[in-house]
Amino acid sequence: MSFVILVVLGLIAGTVGSLIGLGGGIVIVPSLMFLSTVTQLFQDVTPQVAIGTSLLVIIFTGLSSTLAYIKYKTVDYKSGLIFFIGSGPGSMIGAYVSKLFNSNSFSVWFGIFMILISLSLMLKAKARPINKAHKGIIRTFQDDAGEPYTYSYQASVGIAIAFVVGFLGGLFGIGGGSLMVPAMMLLFLFPPKVAVATSMFIIFLSSMTGSVSHMISGHVNWLYALALVPGAWFGGKLGAAINRKMQTKTIVMIMRIVLILIGCQLIYEGIFS
């Protein structure tokens, strides 16, 4: 029974994560923590195990999504590798700091973070890119439909933002795409589909470094990961396909509401349990 639950959870996480560039951890971590409170099947889940297992699964979500987006020619490899200079070390440091959490403090901080992610998704939907002259690294990109895009960024700024995103990803086990995608779109003028695809590439890379830190600390439940990975793999491909064919505004709006509700519930549990 637990295997079936985890496969379905992985599928949902992979689909949602790939669809809007979140990475999937935003579904896996709170779900594992919730399951640990309602059934003895998952009673050994601690915040650290949820985070470490999530990051390991996100490697496969990120890889699956990246391979799908490569087919659609929307991954900016050069920018992704530049940003990984920041996100890689950031995820390792975040993974180390996560050891300081107990269940209550994790619930409070993760709840706050989920609400911030919801606000970030709202910002991505409502805000408009900052008009600026192209300077620094200038990228000209053409998708598989032949549509050309031009955008630019200062490498130092991009790396600094990616470090913070990587740190939060390693700390909470969520990949960090929820913060990276709006930054890429609003500050650097990345086209939305390129931002999501490149974000999944960055998540794939930084999740490897973050999960290694958690593996060393013994924070990965390999049986859970074995069940989560198949669903997350196919979910990553499904999310990329849906992203290509439909507007995601409705899904993002639902996600924002759900994130706020779950975030408030986690904060309440962390304070009053």
From Swiss-Prot:
Which keywords does this chain's UniProt record carry?
Answer: Cell membrane, Membrane, Transmembrane, Transmembrane helix, Transport
InterPro entries the UniProt entry points to = TM_pro_TauE-like, TSUP/Inactive_protease-like
For this UniProt entry, what is the primary localization, expressed as one broad class?
membrane
Q: Which family does it belong to?
A: Belongs to the 4-toluene sulfonate uptake permease (TSUP) (TC 2.A.102) family.
Keyword Lyase among UniProt keywords? no
* Superkingdom of origin: Bacteria
Its subcellular locations are: Cell membrane
Membrane topology field:
Multi-pass membrane protein
Can you name a GO cellular component term? Answer: plasma membrane
UniProt protein name: Probable membrane transporter protein YunE
Transmembrane stretches, by residue range? 3-23, 50-70, 81-101, 105-125, 157-177, 185-205, 222-242, 251-271
